């Protein structure tokens, strides 16, 4: 038999089948760096509309984890897709550099007794070292950005501008000093922001404590009695015995009914609804003697159980009946509600008792408990209450309690003198900060939409923002306070600018080493220079002030507003929150137009990632084994709005999907062998009908993909691209064109038509995948024929796809019908192969018994129907002529019969045809193949 291989147009490409991503991706990174890709994008972006995604800074401590990878990949997909959509989309990565975790790390390594300036020096060095490690990992993920010039909150200019941002807020009168309970961590020795608090289960003692009545006559009158004939106690329930020494009041709800209960040796005042449960807890019998509304008990005095002072009854709406006694003991220094209630009743700051020091130890002067750590003092307080006859019950409970997110230790509320940004404080002009922020939320688009209600609820209910910390490694609050009055220097804003100019040159050390006389002259003796530092959420929360209008100037002409902030859903109470407050305080609007949140990573069973569970996925390991593009494809394929599942099995599925996309792309490239777009590209009207349909299908898909990218539905992009490769291309079009591509003349219209379609599809596909499969798209780009830009990222969405007119005979609807018929034929061919009735599809002859309308439609393909069905023969017949052994199909009005061909197999095209052997010189070939190698070539019109 003659070998006709040389007469075929066999696919050929140097594009490798095996991706080898871990080895090949670093070469692409070097290529991007060598050509200065990011800089070139900025150079061509001048005339483009701008899209700014402002990077929420990760903390400069530790290696990146899978959550970091998700976040950075999502951002990169957006930046790349916006670039391809014709935007100038700069991406300036940033880092959060100040704060306790770094200071704690330095103290752990070098000891706690370092001089403050040395601590700051070592913190700066440590943060810089951590940034370099994280930066290398982010770059390895394929994230395109200004890596040579990222923003860092510890850069001198950033530190200076943070002071300027604070000055703006001082100028507008948002900042004040106050004594308030704040979240306090003994291990940090500092106040914590709301976002630094997490909740965990804690075992706590619960006690019911009786406070003896001091105003017995008033209590009797409140209950409508002439007098009391035995001692009386009002009973509180608490889970914090350590706060009893600081008790200064008792709170009742004005509308709750309270009962005077005769409990034998004494009267007890309890909420009427809780009498039964309380008596059961006390193991006592009792009888309700009288009832009264809470408002009747207002200002009645009771005695502290073991100190010689009174505790008056105050009315408070927050008192509830879900647990306890219906009476809340009030220690204004250690509870926010308690604090505000006592202030409402006229208690001054000087009157508030605060016996717990910053390290959690009672002051030495506190009777009975001085010098004791509060958690260890709990049993001693209980014992004292029992000793004085005020302990009615003592139990333990497990409950959710606030903990430090760094040390995982319990927190307390503690009233300290701190600097605050007032939420409801009236500024010099305009609405309060809370009003501004709530209004700004209505002007912001949230993805997903539920984020709006979440952030609104947090802003609506949050307290004033405590912005001061008592630490070394942080941006200073450069205030001078008058020693006598405690007031800020009248030139504070002006002085802050002078400090900012110094910090710009020397960093935060400029403030800490500053002698007040350098700025205040002779006034210095009258002022104290404070050494508090700013909350790190103020650092990151003012990056819009520095980055968008300052160091990188990537904001819009309208001001420092980013189009998008994108972070994990925890940032509703973190970076989204603090940025909103600073933006509204300084500029009276949010610093972002859209907020996009993603969920947290979990394993395939929905469990949190944990080293103890052994279910963590390390991004560096995935990159080294599978490649960054597999990680990127996994991120894109997941609906990030909820929890994001990841495991080795899930990543392997992503690798399998990647392989299908890569193989499809390789097929396109290999069949463009010898194609010159400059000379061989056919206009749409000269292309075969099937090829026009394929290009049209790509056009429709591109519109859907562009929309999905615009709406950040990357999982839709993934599914559409994958399905296109598997179904429309792999399952239909590419199979059909193989015969034409391989067997017709190399320069024939039939072949150039399908190559034109393949070229257009490849040009579009490489762009579709570029935001997600960044490395692979760049590799594909180099193998595409024709002149092109150095990088796919220097292109925009492909505009060479043509639409199939609705009025052509073989329109979209027509090919949808043909696809359904082909699927039905394929199913029957599979059945016949399984039954060993036929071998390959080309060994089959199929007869389609169709109702008249369908038969007329299929007849439009003429003798090319067999090429669409990939059978050696395809015959149409009326449905009424179907024999008994014809099988039904899923297509209405269609029955099928498949038989094994009795004809010889062509040695070139492998079709079984009756004319094989009729040519003396080529006895192994069919007439069609002889025409293609010796004649003018077969003519195709449709497929």
Curated annotation (Swiss-Prot):
Cofactor binding, per record: Binds 1 zinc ion per subunit.
Renumbered ranges of motif 'KMSKS' region: 608-612
Positions of short motif 'HIGH' region: 58-68
Name under which the protein is recorded: Isoleucine--tRNA ligase
Domain notes: IleRS has two distinct active sites: one for aminoacylation and one for editing. The misactivated valine is translocated from the active site to the editing site, which sterically excludes the correctly activated isoleucine. The single editing site contains two valyl binding pockets, one specific for each substrate (Val-AMP or Val-tRNA(Ile)).
Function as written in the Swiss-Prot or TrEMBL entry: Catalyzes the attachment of isoleucine to tRNA(Ile). As IleRS can inadvertently accommodate and process structurally similar amino acids such as valine, to avoid such errors it has two additional distinct tRNA(Ile)-dependent editing activities. One activity is designated as 'pretransfer' editing and involves the hydrolysis of activated Val-AMP. The other activity is designated 'posttransfer' editing and involves deacylation of mischarged Val-tRNA(Ile).
GO MF, one example: ATP binding
Native organism: Pseudomonas aeruginosa (strain UCBPP-PA14)
Residues binding L-isoleucyl-5'-AMP, per UniProt: 567
Pfam families (alphabetical): Anticodon_1, tRNA-synt_1, zf-FPG_IleRS
PROSITE patterns: AA_TRNA_LIGASE_I (PS00178)
The reaction(s) this protein catalyses: tRNA(Ile) + L-isoleucine + ATP = L-isoleucyl-tRNA(Ile) + AMP + diphosphate
Quaternary organization: Monomer.
GO biological process per UniProt: isoleucyl-tRNA aminoacylation
Stated family: Belongs to the class-I aminoacyl-tRNA synthetase family. IleS type 1 subfamily.
Signal peptide segment: none
Cited InterPro entries: aa-tRNA-synth_I_CS, aa-tRNA-synth_Ia, Anticodon_Ile_BEm, Ile-tRNA-ligase, Ile-tRNA-ligase_type1, Ile-tRNA_ligase, M/V/L/I-tRNA-synth_anticd-bd, Rossmann-like_a/b/a_fold
Gene it is expressed from: ileS
Highest taxon above the source species: Bacteria
GO cellular component, one term: cytosol
